[in-house]
Regions:
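Short, Lys/Arg-rich, polar N-terminal cytosolic tail immediately upstream
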Residues: 1-14
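A structural signal for multi-pass alpha-helical bundles of membrane permease subunits
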Residues: 13-302
């Protein structure tokens, strides 16, 4: 005999849906208000001549693709994209990935002593605020004799150096690698935990060396997490602003003027909000293309 449902009471399925909506609703609303809406508004601004001051600030006009045509024909913007690609490749894809993988492998090594101290030292740059890290490194690499780097050189009888002026891009790449190793280590360490020890031991019994085991056994099994990290670190590194701005402000000249610095200067220093928004949209499209490329290489369905 089927019991009659009491009038006015919801079924368990509807109660579950109601609870799910109640729990997810605030988060979805916050994302819509503070992420999706500003992003859509930024895309709209990219097609206008909006400025911070002047008549265009009061009554912006729709200009279609004019901002994009100007940017794609601008040597300064294209050069900033090239510098951004160089910065992302050497600091994120090469530096952070390789050193992060090395740190994760060392934490799994049985012969390593003091793993807790080693892990803490690697994680330390991650918890230091970007502004604090930037100003600290600016003091360390100062061209003055009081700079920590020059004091160390003086101890060995060498003359003073000015890394931020003589090799600005190399300096910011090294500092960004220092800050990003921690995330790579955490993600790769978690991925390595899923690699069966039996496969590694079997490969060693067959005579495979450490590099052969890593290349033919470990790396194929963590292919997905590696490409996921490459995607995440590419996105975050393209958006690096504070580190470079507080260290060099895009200089000397335009040597470290990345796309993020270029967008900031156009939007806020030159008051060209529409132009800065258009540059952001171009950067977003390039990141989407890179993301699809990473997913294709990793053989991950999107």
């Amino acid at each position: 005999v089927t019991a009659a449902r009491t009038p006015g009471r919801l079924s368990p399925r509807w109660r579950q849906r109601g609870a799910l909506s109640l729990l997810l609703g605030p988060s979805v609303l916050l994302i819509a208000v503070f992420v999706i809406a500003p992003a859509c508004y930024g895309v709209y601004l990219a097609f206008t001549d909006t400025q911070l001051t002047g008549w265009a600030a009061r009554d912006p006009q729709f200009v279609g693709l004019e901002n994009f045509r100007h940017l794609l024909g601008s040597e300064d913007f294209l050069a900033s994209l090239g510098r951004t690609g160089q910065f992302v490749f050497w600091s994120a894809i090469v530096g952070q990935t390789l050193l992060g993988m090395l740190a994760a492998l060392l934490l799994r090594a049985k012969w390593l002593r003091g793993k807790g101290l080693f892990g803490s030292l690697v994680l330390l740059p991650m918890v230091v605020p970007e502004v604090v890290a930037s100003l600290t490194w600016a003091s360390v690499l100062s061209s003055d004799d009081s700079g920590t780097f020059n004091r160390l050189l003086a101890m060995f009888g060498s003359g003073a150096a000015a890394p931020l002026q003589d090799s600005p891009m190399l300096s910011v790449i090294i500092i960004n690698v220092w800050r990003g190793i921690a995330l790579a280590m955490i993600m790769f360490q978690a991925a390595l935990e899923d690699v069966p020890d039996e496969l590694i031991e079997a490969a060693r019994m067959d005579g495979a060396g450490a590099l052969q085991v890593f290349r033919h056994v470990t790396l194929p099994l963590i292919r997905g997490p590696v490409f996921l990290y490459l995607l995440l670190t590419t996105i975050t590194t393209v958006g690096v602003f504070g580190l470079v701005y507080f260290l060099t402000q895009g200089g000397p000249g335009q040597d470290t003027e990345l796309s993020s610095i270029y967008i900031f200067q156009r939007a806020f220093q030159y008051s060209q909000i529409g132009m800065g928004s258009a540059a952001s949209v171009i950067l977003l499209v390039l990141l989407m293309v890179l993301g699809l490329t990473y997913a294709r290489l990793a053989k991950v369905k999107v």
